[in-house]
Each structure stands twice: as structure tokens, then as C-alpha cells.
């Protein structure tokens, strides 16, 4: 019975994560982590590591698809990615020292903020509007946003994709499809770094 429950939960978690990543640039950890914790009673820290590992392939496939349709900003994405990777390790280290309840509450708060943002201020930016932003401004914002996203991705996993989308559209002025494409491109590498550092610090499940 337990094996059947595990298979069913994993199938639903995988399906939800795939749809969320491909359609909205959401981290797979936003779906997988709470399902593993709630139904399979896996420790939150371990669940985040598993979810981030699942995120690697899902994000890579989504990024390839968005890239083929020219909805991917690789230049600024690479700058942001390097900063994100550095702070992902820091976030993973801090999360191992923080109580599980705090991690869960932070994840819920980030999801709530993202939902409110898109309801109050929908993304109406076009690709033409994006081109008007000075190159230097983009680089500075990429570094700052990368540091924030990297820490959050390593800390709770679920916040990585959602926060990245929030910052790309709200702070950096990205058009929505390009924001999603760039987000999943960066998440491919943050998820890989996050999962490896999680298991290196906390041990493999």
C-alpha cells in the first residue's frame, strides 16, 4: 500500500511540476516539495534536494523550447546565472541551520507575493520596451537580482523560479515569455547546484 501511495504521489508531483515549469517558469520544487512532505512525510530539507534534482531536466527541456522560439535572453541570463550559482550554495548552507517551519512559511510568503503582483500589476511589457533599457542598467540589475534569487533558491528551492519570474518582470522589465524562458534557463543550473549542495551538506536521501 505504501509503495502504491509513493508511486501515485510521485506521478502527480511530476505532472504538476512539468506543467508549472513549462507553462509558467515555476520551479518544480514548488509542487514536489510540499507533496513529498505532506503525503510521504519526507524531511523538508531532503524533499527540497529531491525537488531541485528533478528541476534540472524539466528546466533544461523548457529552456530549449523557449530558446527555439527566441524567447530567451542568454547574455543577461548568463550574468545572472553566475551570481545565482554562487548564492545558491550560501542559501543551501543557511537552510540546513534553519528550522523546517521557517522554511515552509517563507515558501508560502513568496508564492503569495508573486500571485498578488500578477493580479495587481499584470505584465504588459513588449520586446520593444525591453530593448530601450540601457545595457549597463541590465547588467547591474542582473547581478543584484541574481544574488537574491540564488540565496532563495538554495534556501527553500521553491522560491527560485517564482522569485526569478517576479524580479525579471517587475524589476528588470522583461516581456513575460522572455522572462519565463530566461527563468527556466537559469533554473537548469541553479537547480543542479542547489541539489548537489543540499545532498553534500545534508547527505543523500
Enumerate the language-model features and the residues they cover:
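Transmembrane helix boundary and interhelical junction motifs in multipass membrane proteins
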Residues: 23-32, 156-167
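Non-catalytic alpha-helical scaffold/packing segments enriched in small hydrophobic residues
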Residues: 142-143, 163-167, 171, 178, ...
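Short hydrophobic/aromatic, small-residue-rich stretches within specific transmembrane helices
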Residues: 51-55, 183-187
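Juxtamembrane transmembrane-helix boundary motif
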Residues: 1-19, 31-39, 44, 64-155, ...
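Small-residue-rich packing faces within the transmembrane alpha-helices of Major Facilitator Superfamily
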Residues: 56-59, 112-115, 188-191
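Small-residue hotspots at the loop-to-helix junctions and early N-terminal turns
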Residues: 44-48, 180, 184
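Glycine/small-residue-rich hydrophobic helix-like segments
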Residues: 184-205
Amino acid at each position: 500500500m505504501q509503495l502504491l501511495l509513493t508511486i501515485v504521489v510521485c506521478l502527480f508531483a511530476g505532472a504538476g511540476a512539468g506543467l508549472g515549469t513549462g507553462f509558467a517558469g515555476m520551479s518544480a520544487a514548488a509542487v514536489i516539495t510540499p507533496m513529498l512532505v505532506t503525503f510521504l512525510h519526507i524531511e523538508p530539507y531532503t524533499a527540497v534536494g529531491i525537488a531541485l534534482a528533478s528541476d534540472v531536466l524539466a528546466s533544461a527541456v523548457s529552456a530549449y523550447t523557449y530558446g527555439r522560439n527566441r524567447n530567451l535572453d542568454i547574455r543577461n541570463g548568463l550574468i545572472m546565472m553566475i551570481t545565482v550559482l554562487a548564492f545558491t550554495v550560501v542559501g543551501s548552507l543557511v537552510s540546513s541551520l534553519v528550522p523546517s517551519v521557517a522554511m515552509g512559511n517563507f515558501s508560502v510568503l513568496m508564492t503569495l507575493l508573486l500571485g498578488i503582483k500578477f493580479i495587481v500589476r499584470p505584465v504588459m511589457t513588449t520586446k520593444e520596451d525591453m530593448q530601450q533599457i540601457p545595457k549597463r542598467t541590465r547588467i547591474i540589475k542582473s547581478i543584484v537580482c541574481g544574488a537574491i534569487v540564488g540565496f532563495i533558491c538554495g534556501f527553500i528551492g521553491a522560491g527560485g523560479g517564482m522569485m526569478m519570474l517576479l524580479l525579471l518582470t517587475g524589476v528588470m522589465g522583461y516581456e513575460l515569455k522572455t522572462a519565463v524562458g530566461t527563468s527556466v534557463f537559469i533554473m537548469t543550473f541553479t537547480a543542479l547546484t542547489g541539489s548537489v549542495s543540499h545532498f553534500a551538506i545534508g547527505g543523500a536521501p
